[in-house]
Regions:
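Formylglycine-dependent sulfatase
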Residues: 1-188
Length: 188
């Protein structure tokens, strides 16, 4: 809201996870001008079938791998708003466990590329799901790196990079069922 008052175009794309309903009510969206999100993206979509809601709460299908679909929407927002200051919050769900199946679904071809590769020694010594899941997890992380690289490339090509602040954060890592029988929710 504050940035909008200062003339910024504001946008939110991806997983919200702060609302109490699906789709998220307009008054619960933090005041963003542009909205393309879902409160619980892991329940409204899967790796290759991404559904979000637009500013009018209409369900929107985004084609392709979910990281790529959200990234494509973000790049579109950047291009449409390049002539004025903008604030864009991109919330990727990956590298999140897919809730409807015991898997970390990476892009096609990425699981094979990373399965059997390096595993942190402390993780390898614990009983859990890392031998089965780490290849998919690493593939998801690699695709996130590529996605942010794509966004940064667009920002650079539009000559916006020197006047931009890019902040990357994460809400949780993963313990691969080594601390409890779930993939997260452990205090350690």
């Amino acid at each position: 809201k504050y940035l909008s008052k200062e003339g910024y175009a504001t946008g939110y794309i991806g997983k919200w996870h702060l609302g109490s309903s699906e789709p998220v009510k307009k008054e619960d969206r933090g005041g963003y001008d542009y909205w393309l999100g879902s409160n619980l993206l892991e329940f409204t979509s899967d790796a290759y079938e991404t559904y979000v809601y637009d500013g009018q709460n209409k369900k929107v299908f985004l084609p392709g791998y979910r990281v790529d679909a959200i990234t494509d929407a973000a790049i579109n927002f950047i291009k449409l708003n390049q002539k004025k200051p903008f604030f864009l919050f991109v919330s990727l769900i990956e590298p999140h466990h897919q809730n409807n199946t015991d898997d970390y679904p990476p892009p096609i071809g990425y699981r094979e590329k990373y399965t059997g590769k390096w595993s942190p020694p402390d993780l390898s010594s614990l009983v859990g799901s890392s031998p089965r899941h780490l290849g998919g997890y690493y593939g998801m992380v690699k695709r996130i790196d590529e996605a942010y690289g794509r966004m940064i490339d667009v920002i650079k090509s539009l000559k916006l990079f020197d006047d931009s602040a890019i902040i990357f954060t994460s809400d949780h890592g993963n313990n691969f069922k080594t601390r409890n029988r779930e993939y997260k929710r452990s205090c350690h």
